[in-house]
Amino acid sequence: MKVNLMKSGFLAASLLLCAAPLTVVAQDMPAGAWAGTWVANSAKSKFPGPAPTMDQVTIEPDGSVAVHVVSADGKTTDWSYKPQAGKSVSIQGRDNTTVEVVKVSDYRNNQIWTHEGKITQTHSTLSKDGKVQTFYGAPGTYRAPGETKAKPFSEVVVYEKQ
């Protein structure tokens, strides 16, 4: 009986040790071909208002995303996040905002954004040659910081890899 308990304990410990790395891998979302620095091409994009003078996204190989935007009126905004598979994560630099990124394929990611309890779904595509990334914002309304009234919101941003 002691031998069976020892074998069972050894088997359980072995399974836990083998499963632990799988849990870590399942949470990571490496960027693959999405990694790099991307700059918006305003001429090919559609913004809800005046186009920003700079819209740059940097995606690290580990999947971390950093966004740098300079609005048409010169205001700078920086925000970032590191997506985790199956998990909504907080966005640094955007209060009360989270995002869950769902990998649909190597060429498409869906995003579920939550801002102050309101949910918005968007998606991004990557061209087969890996040189163009397109972000498709969900139609709806958006209240810009400092504004009291929401405005219609629709956005398609074409980013080119640098």
What are these regions (language model features)?
Residues Q27-Q162:
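Hydrophobic small-molecule pocket/channel-lining residues, especially in calycin-type beta-barrels
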